């Protein structure tokens, strides 16, 4: 079976992209275990705890990331450079994601047959 990477690169709540990506990821996890999840650029904001989306009349889907364990999604990486650029190096995110420098992240992403970006 093909290995599928889900790349989150947009901030939450500004568009439906993050929510749709998460829905697609959870649905795909029912079909295969060959999944990887990557958070790069503004996508690192998807994993911030304590968001208040109701203030901008958005749905709170961020808590759904906590279901990764239930869905056996354990291959999760976050861009270390993106964290530094945004001052988020010491944040406890809603999921355990392994920080990787951009070169290592691209190498890991290269191991996947299909890349879906949200």
Swiss-Prot record:
Its main location: cytoplasm. Transmembrane segments: none annotated. GO terms for cellular component: cytoplasm. It holds the Pfam family DsrE. Keywords: Cytoplasm, tRNA processing. InterPro entries: DsrEFH-like, Sulphur_relay_DsrE/F-like, Sulphur_relay_TusC, Sulphur_relay_TusC/DsrF. The keyword DNA-binding does not apply. GO terms for biological process: tRNA processing. Heterohexamer, formed by a dimer of trimers. The hexameric TusBCD complex contains 2 copies each of TusB, TusC and TusD. The TusBCD complex interacts with TusE. This is Protein TusC. It comes from Salmonella gallinarum (strain 287/91 / NCTC 13346). The lineage of its organism: Bacteria, Pseudomonadati, Pseudomonadota, Gammaproteobacteria, Enterobacterales.
């Amino acid at each position: 079976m093909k290995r599928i990477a889900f790349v989150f690169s947009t901030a939450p709540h500004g568009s439906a992209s993050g929510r749709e990506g998460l829905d697609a990821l959870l649905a795909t996890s029912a079909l295969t275990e060959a999944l990887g999840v990557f958070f790069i650029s503004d996508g690192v904001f998807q994993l911030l705890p304590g968001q208040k989306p109701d203030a901008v009349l958005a749905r709170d889907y961020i808590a759904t990331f906590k279901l990764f364990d239930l869905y056996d999604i354990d291959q999760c990486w976050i861009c270390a450079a993106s964290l530094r650029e945004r001052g988020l190096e010491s944040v406890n995110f809603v999921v355990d994601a392994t920080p990787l420098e951009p070169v290592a992240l691209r190498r890991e992403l290269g191991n996947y047959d299909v890349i879906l970006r949200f």
